[in-house]
């Protein structure tokens, strides 16, 4: 295996996980903050807000998992070798 390809794969794997976690991290923080604010305004709607929040957090977390899958593919099933 060429050392340059190996080094580039490791760097690309790190970047894919790092960049894939920035957007969902910001989105999850914003969504949780807005959910807490909504529950504070209307405590009777807590169940509906919480259910919607958990579903949206799962969808946002899926984006980070896709970045992890790309990183694992680059590290262990490298298509460039």
Curated annotation (Swiss-Prot):
Source species of the chain: Pinus thunbergii
UniProt gene name: atpH
Membrane topology of the entry: Multi-pass membrane protein
Segments passing through the bilayer: 3-23, 57-77
Keyword Mitochondrion (UniProt): no
Protein name: ATP synthase subunit c, chloroplastic
Molecular function in Gene Ontology: lipid binding; proton-transporting ATP synthase activity, rotational mechanism
Database matches in HAMAP family: ATP_synth_c_bact
GO CC, alphabetical: chloroplast thylakoid membrane; proton-transporting ATP synthase complex; proton-transporting two-sector ATPase complex, proton-transporting domain
Pfam families, per database record: ATP-synt_C
Database matches in InterPro entries: ATP_synth_csu_bac/chlpt, ATP_synth_F0_csu, ATP_synth_F0_csu_DDCD_BS, ATP_synth_F0_csu_sf, ATPase_proteolipid_c-like_dom, F/V-ATP_Csub_sf
Free-text function comment from the UniProt entry: F(1)F(0) ATP synthase produces ATP from ADP in the presence of a proton or sodium gradient. F-type ATPases consist of two structural domains, F(1) containing the extramembraneous catalytic core and F(0) containing the membrane proton channel, linked together by a central stalk and a peripheral stalk. During catalysis, ATP synthesis in the catalytic domain of F(1) is coupled via a rotary mechanism of the central stalk subunits to proton translocation. Key component of the F(0) channel; it plays a direct role in translocation across the membrane. A homomeric c-ring of between 10-14 subunits forms the central stalk rotor element with the F(1) delta and epsilon subunits.
């Amino acid at each position: 295996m060429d050392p340059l390809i190996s080094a580039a794969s490791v760097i690309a794997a790190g970047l894919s996980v790092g960049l894939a976690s920035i957007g969902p991290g910001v989105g999850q923080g914003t969504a949780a903050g807005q959910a807490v604010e909504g529950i504070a305004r209307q405590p009777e709607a807590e169940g509906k807000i919480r259910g919607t929040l958990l579903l949206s957090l799962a969808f946002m977390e899926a984006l980070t998992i896709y970045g992890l899958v790309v990183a694992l593919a680059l590290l262990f099933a490298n298509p460039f070798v």
